[in-house]
Amino acid sequence: MRRVALSVLFQSSRVLHFTDLRDKQIALCNAAPGHTVQFHQHRRHSSAPVSSVGGQNTFSCLGASCAGLLHPSRVRFANRRRSGSTSKKAQVKSSVNQLAIPSAATRERRKPKLSNSCAPAVESQKVGVAPTTSRASGETRTSCAPPPASRMKPSFYVVAVGRQRGIYSTWDQCSEQVKGFSGAVYKSFRTLSEARAYLTAHPARSGLEKSDRGDGAASLSALSEPQVGLRRSRAAEAEASYVVEAPAQPTLRQRVEEEVPSGAAAVQRAESSVPQVVYVDGACSHNGTPKARAGYGGFYGSTSDSRNFSLPVPITEAQTNNRGEMRAVIHCIVQGFVDAGVPPAALGTSHCVEPDWELSELPQPLRRLVIYTDSRYVIDGLTRYALKWVANGFKLASKEPVLNQDLWRQLIRLRDAYNTRYAEQQHWAAATCSHASTRVPAASQSKRFHTHNTRNDETEGIELRHVKGHSNDYGNEMADVLAVAGARMHGTSE
């Protein structure tokens, strides 16, 4: 297809002169009725049925007002032959005089008619509705449908995952919640009902919702009762004032009880649920000295989450930073079991290698657990050395015993039990898609437990992810605050 440029050369009293027309399909014309639009075509060969006058194509304007787009069906071409001996000025004059310009009655008869089914085209253009022309009837029908959503300016911004969930009325307010936020999820909508539906369809996850401070920093002044959670600061109150609407989200247990009546459906619901994300850290003052006091903490992404914890390492055991890191991960795994229906008292016995509560039978499905930690000691121990330690009786290459064996045994057992139960749920869900009464025997998945699986990815029930410590990561900073507070609790208990 030939594409050539269009530009105005000059305008006489009744003739508009243009250069080449793009494929002779449309032209922009501001001529009054009866004016002539003249095109100067540099390329002489054309597939369009247009006559030439001195190498120039001409037609007359027929509409009441030619402002807008002209189609070949609305123009009238002059049947003129090229005259090679006359000058350009003579050619233009000759073409004007010999054009078949229609009469006023003809122009009135050919004038497009407006349909009464909607507002006039002029009014519709004011509200962003473009009129459509029917070639067959000559009528111009205006469409009352709004323009495509992609071209409409959004009025509501939904932050599903960010520093503060909710619906915002301006982009500036929305960007404050998602800019620089890892894993932010947000979307714009034209109507409030669509925004509400999107927010409801994306329930609050345990991912990070930074509602205290925007710079990722944290301080001990934000703590009230570390064992329960963090107190919302005034910055969070001010930030929350921007929210137009943020409906309360049900807990995992409420969603399972209300939305998933059967066991198989509950497993399917858990399979598609958003992973539970938690940041953990350990701290120790005077590490390596007799005055050492260790603590650990965990942050579930929101300062209002009651599962946030800040606890001291028991004074009856070694006070080290590594034991704090290990205890924090153990606490998170046990909390995952508690969320699935294990009695909350299990958190008090999480340090026991053989707890007095059952790991296998759970009334609710386990959620996939993603734990962020800055401890390579814990990650490498579980993913690289656990299988070897279990096989050789927790011995190092130097035949020396592995330190912190009590916590390693408990951590490996809990991790393997969690992964085994989670995998069984996934297989159960797959098996019960067609036969709800059929359940995969637990024995078919017992191999995972006995081999102490060391995989660490999104296919497992528990995934450990490394985060660089003291790198202004909000979740890590908040976990560090809780861990330090836990270490300082030794002074209040002694």
Curated annotation (Swiss-Prot):
Cofactor(s) essential for the protein: Mg(2+)
InterPro entries: Ribosomal_bL9/RNase_H1_N (IPR009027), RNase_H (IPR050092), RNase_H1_N (IPR011320), RNase_H1_N_sf (IPR037056), RNaseH-like_sf (IPR012337), RNaseH_domain (IPR002156), RNaseH_sf (IPR036397)
One record GO biological process: DNA replication, removal of RNA primer
Region (Disordered): 79-148, 205-231
Keyword Metal-binding belongs to the record: yes
EC class: hydrolase
Domain RNase H type-1: residue ranges: 272-488
Gene3D superfamilies: Ribonuclease H-like superfamily/Ribonuclease H, Ribonuclease H1, N-terminal domain
Keywords for the protein's UniProt record, in alphabetical order: Endonuclease, Hydrolase, Magnesium, Metal-binding, Nuclease
Catalyses which reaction(s): Endonucleolytic cleavage to 5'-phosphomonoester
Entries under SUPFAM superfamilies matching the protein: L9 N-domain-like (SSF55658), Ribonuclease H-like (SSF53098)
MF terms (GO), sorted A to Z: metal ion binding; nucleic acid binding; RNA-DNA hybrid ribonuclease activity
Biased composition (Polar residues): 84-100, 131-143
E.C. number: 3.1.26.4
Pfam families: Cauli_VI, RNase_H
PROSITE patterns for the chain: RNASE_H_1
Annotated binding of Mg(2+) 1, by residue: D281, E325, D374
Keyword Nuclease recorded: yes
PANTHER family reported for this sequence: RIBONUCLEASE H1 (PTHR10642:SF26)
Binding partners and assembly: Monomer.
Job description of the protein: Endonuclease that specifically degrades the RNA of RNA-DNA hybrids.
Family as reported in the entry's similarity comment: Belongs to the RNase H family.
Name of the protein described by the UniProt record: Ribonuclease H
Organism the protein comes from: Crithidia fasciculata
Highest classification ranks of the organism: Eukaryota, Discoba, Euglenozoa, Kinetoplastea, Metakinetoplastina
Gene: RNH1
